[in-house]
UniProtKB/Swiss-Prot annotation:
Residues 73-84 have a biased composition (Basic residues). It holds the Pfam family Ribosomal_L21p. Keywords: Ribonucleoprotein, Ribosomal protein, RNA-binding, rRNA-binding. GO terms for biological process: translation. This protein binds to 23S rRNA in the presence of protein L20. The keyword NAD does not apply. Part of the 50S ribosomal subunit. Contacts protein L20. GO terms for molecular function: rRNA binding; structural constituent of ribosome. The gene is rplU. This is Large ribosomal subunit protein bL21. Residues 85-96 have a biased composition (Polar residues). It comes from the Bacteria. Belongs to the bacterial ribosomal protein bL21 family. One of its GO terms (cellular component) is ribosome.
């Protein structure tokens, strides 16, 4: 059985036991999150907007890979290099 969930305007197709990286959530490490399910997929049956929730356990808060932002204006000796690392939360789906 699979479920379609939405966290921070991003959709994820999850099963029990899946580990995902989602944008930073305000939940303590080791705590649980209740996420509303958008759809439940069970073989050939698909139920939209079920009254079920997905329970996920927070494994940790980490930073994503670095994204390099480079700006340059030709013939003007202007160069700017900046890096950005987005904060992410690692979660594990406990139950559907």
């Amino acid at each position: 059985m699979q479920a379609l969930i939405k966290i921070s305007d991003k959709q994820y197709l999850v099963q029990k036991g899946d580990t995902l990286f989602v944008p930073r959530q305000k939940t303590d490490i080791g705590g649980t999150m209740e996420i509303a399910s958008m759809a439940r997929i069970d073989g050939a049956n698909t139920v939209l907007n079920p009254a079920e929730t997905v329970t996920a356990k927070v494994l940790g808060h980490v930073k994503d890979d670095k994204v390099v932002v480079f700006k340059k204006k030709r013939r003007k000796r202007y160069q700017s290099r900046n890096g950005h690392r987005q904060q992410m939360t690692q979660i594990e789906v406990v139950s559907l």
